[in-house]
């Protein structure tokens, strides 16, 4: 049985991870949970999974959580009260929890960086759903992985697809996972993108896009932030940077293809011109399950893919006019150093302000480009962790400042 720590248990990745644990109780045991403010859901998760430690983001909620757990303990719905913690200390403790074999990092954004590093330093394997950690701090995370021997298993569908295609190759047989070493034997990878909420919109119509429009994904069920990232194609741009670190590829070896059906999750082109692809229904539970069960596969009762029911699979090149964030991500990745951290932080803050209706959808790439341009003269090619955290904070403040001076609030 594999013991699992779930960081971000009430979010999209966290809840799906716990669903899998419930489906396979003989395979997985949940030993640690971290969550935000959704106490009702956390209580249900504690009752179901009986973890050893629980941490909340907000310390002020600990008293209420403790009281409610005491009641459940008295009623024998909880066998043993878990250790209760809060804040950064609790998050890092859960990430490095002694009995955990695997840590699922489902926290959105750069907030997942420090607990990811805590897990790595403790020698834990990670199921990485928090791509921003690797993007912002790849120069720190990759050396930490090499030092600890931890393995980074990609939990998003695209990188999981590449990872699955590489099983049995020299890369998988001879390398520690995710050390950034060059991948022998293949020419390139092709990351597929659904095209997001606006794939059928004309570029000139995006000026009218609302928050509701941007958070309505045609294929996937995800959180609001990543759904907006899908709509801008920044999500795919960030995945390009992640793939660079995961598989040791140059940016010229990583291609983005629009595939509206989201059935082919990504492809690997080998040196001999063969192409390997991983197919499946657009369901995040499958890549999460593969992380949890790897190197084994588990039999599931989930719906089977029947291509005859789908009929056609279509592909096209992304429209750079409609998706300027894609090119911003390639540029930041090629610049290296602290530039991806600036890109990531600026994007996170810009999306946050858009979701608050502080400015328009089309302003997201404008803000990000302005902040990245401003950082060029201060680019640090070999940053420390403290320098990455400092530049992350700087970029967020710059987005606020820029938006107040240059952006008009959404009005339709």
UniProtKB/Swiss-Prot annotation:
Pathway per the UniProt entry: Isoprenoid biosynthesis; isopentenyl diphosphate biosynthesis via DXP pathway; isopentenyl diphosphate from 1-deoxy-D-xylulose 5-phosphate: step 1/6
Annotated EC: 1.1.1.267
Binding site for Mn(2+): 156, 158, 239
Catalytic reaction equation(s): 2-C-methyl-D-erythritol 4-phosphate + NADP(+) = 1-deoxy-D-xylulose 5-phosphate + NADPH + H(+)
GO terms assigned for molecular function: 1-deoxy-D-xylulose-5-phosphate reductoisomerase activity; manganese ion binding; NADPH binding
Binding-site residues for 1-deoxy-D-xylulose 5-phosphate, renumbered to this chain: 131, 157-158, 194, 217, 230, 235-236, 239
Binding site for NADPH: 10-13, 36-38, 130, 132, 223
One Pfam family, short name: DXPR_C
SUPFAM superfamilies: 1-deoxy-D-xylulose-5-phosphate reductoisomerase, C-terminal domain, Glyceraldehyde-3-phosphate dehydrogenase-like, C-terminal domain, NAD(P)-binding Rossmann-fold domains
InterPro entries documented for this protein: DXP_reductoisomerase (IPR003821), DXP_reductoisomerase_C (IPR013644), DXP_reductoisomerase_N (IPR013512), DXPR_C (IPR026877), DXPR_C_sf (IPR036169), NAD(P)-bd_dom_sf (IPR036291)
Cofactor(s) required, per the database record: Mg(2+); Mn(2+)
Reported function: Catalyzes the NADPH-dependent rearrangement and reduction of 1-deoxy-D-xylulose-5-phosphate (DXP) to 2-C-methyl-D-erythritol 4-phosphate (MEP).
Similarity comment: family membership: Belongs to the DXR family.
HAMAP family: DXP_reductoisom
PANTHER family: 1-DEOXY-D-XYLULOSE 5-PHOSPHATE REDUCTOISOMERASE (PTHR30525), 1-DEOXY-D-XYLULOSE 5-PHOSPHATE REDUCTOISOMERASE, CHLOROPLASTIC (PTHR30525:SF0)
Stated name of the protein: 1-deoxy-D-xylulose 5-phosphate reductoisomerase
Originating species: Prochlorococcus marinus (strain NATL2A)
Protein's gene: dxr
């Amino acid at each position: 049985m594999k013991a699992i720590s779930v960081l971000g248990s009430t979010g999209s990745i966290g809840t799906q991870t716990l669903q899998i644990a419930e489906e396979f109780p003989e395979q997985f045991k949940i030993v640690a949970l971290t969550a935000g403010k959704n106490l009702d859901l956390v209580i249900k998760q504690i009752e179901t999974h009986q973890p050893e430690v629980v941490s909340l983001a907000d310390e002020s909620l600990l008293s209420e959580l403790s009281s409610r757990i005491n009641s459940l303990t008295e009623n024998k719905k909880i066998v043993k009260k878990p250790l209760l913690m809060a804040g950064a200390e609790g998050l890092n403790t859960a990430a490095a929890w002694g009995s955990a074999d695997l840590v699922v990092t489902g926290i959105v954004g750069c907030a997942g960086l420090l607990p990811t590093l805590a897990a790595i330093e403790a020698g834990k394997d990670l199921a990485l759903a928090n791509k921003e950690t690797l993007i912002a701090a790849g120069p720190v995370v990759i050396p930490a992985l090499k030092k600890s021997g931890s393995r980074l298993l990609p939990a998003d569908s695209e990188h999981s697809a590449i990872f699955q295609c590489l099983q049995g190759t020299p890369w998988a047989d001879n390398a520690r996972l995710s050390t950034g070493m060059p991948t022998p034997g293949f020419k390139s990878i092709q990351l597929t993108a659904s095209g997001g909420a606006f794939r059928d919109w004309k570029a000139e119509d995006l000026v009218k896009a609302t928050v509701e429009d941007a958070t309505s994904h045609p294929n996937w069920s995800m959180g609001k932030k990543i759904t907006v990232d899908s709509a801008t194609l920044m999500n795919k741009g960030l995945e390009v940077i992640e793939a660079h670190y995961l598989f040791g590829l140059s940016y010229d070896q990583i291609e983005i293809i629009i595939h509206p059906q989201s059935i082919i999750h990504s492809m690997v082109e080998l040196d001999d011109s063969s192409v390997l692809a991983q197919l499946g229904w657009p369901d995040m539970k499958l890549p999460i399950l593969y992380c949890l069960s790897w190197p084994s596969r588990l039999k599931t009762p989930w719906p089977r893919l029947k291509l005859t029911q789908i009929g056609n699979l279509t592909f096209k090149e992304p429209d750079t006019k409609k998706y300027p964030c894609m090119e911003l991500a390639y540029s930041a990745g090629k610049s290296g150093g602290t530039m991806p951290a600036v890109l990531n932080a600026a994007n996170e803050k810009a999306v946050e302000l858009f979701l608050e209706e502080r400015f328009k959808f089309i302003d997201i790439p404008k803000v990000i480009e302005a902040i990245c341009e401003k950082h060029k003269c201060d680019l640090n090619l070999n940053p420390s962790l403290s320098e990455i955290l400092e530049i992350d904070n700087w970029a967020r403040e710059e987005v606020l400042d820029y938006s107040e001076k240059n952006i008009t609030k959404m009005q339709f």
